[in-house]
Amino acid sequence: MEKLNLSNSMKLYKEAQDYVPGAVLGIRRPYNFVEGEYPIFFENGQGGRVTDVDGNEYIDMLCAYGPIIIGHREKEIDDVVVEQIRNKGFCFSLTQPHQNELAEVLRQMIPCAEQSIFMTTGSDATTAAVRIARASTKRNKILRCGYHGWHDWCVEVHGGIPAKMYEDVHEFHYNDLEGFEALMKQHGDDVAAVIVTPVGHPLAEPMQHPKPGFLQGLRDATTKNGTVLIFDEIRSGFRVHLGGAQVPFGVTPDLSVFGKAMANGYPISAVVGKKSVMKVAEKEVFISSTFFPNSLAYVAALKT
């Protein structure tokens, strides 16, 4: 096999090391790869293919790590975004009608989505869901299973985070119902939420499907304990099923978080859930960002 010419990528990589720590952020940092073969700087994409700065073409099997569910530069989606920019504007930092339209669409598709809160990233959504659960239950502890983002309470790499941050967060293994039940027995009176990826995808490990009874076992235990069950559907949402993995698996959580494939690459995420739990976000829980009410992401999501 002929070795790829990556000379332009390597030149940009050398420059980037001066501008950006490690040149590239995230789990795809250069030290995880073969020297001289990575990082590759991409210049454009169309449909299911992307091209780097050296002209090499690739099939985007990762779909940009999840968001590009339909294809790069999908004309129908990009057209509604351009129309919004040209004719209406998009950064108002105030509520726009598209919020209601999108919330109604999610309500029709997702079993638990009685109400919705829209944000930007998956980490925004998982962190907001945990905060809502703690406020709703007046409890502190979180039982988690899977990758839930880079924020302090859940990140896999602990550099720069005080150890006490993890005192109220305990991890159990996917499909290990017995181990989960032991944690619930130990911490039950103070467990605010159980957050789990309904399709198992631990960081850098193979994906897993739930064993019979696993998700229902979580549902039964959390209901009995008055604990909020959260499905992290950032990856599975709109991919396993339009309504998330909760539809084919037949287990309805109290809250769910969605993102990635929601708007074909435009940055948006959501916490959706039952009104009885979400109501604390009216006054008691503060969730805010200048860029959360973004009409470009709204119209892209609606078109997607």
Language-model regions, residue ranges each:
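Conserved N-terminal phosphate-binding loop of PLP-dependent enzymes in the Aspartate aminotransferase
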Residues: E2-T304
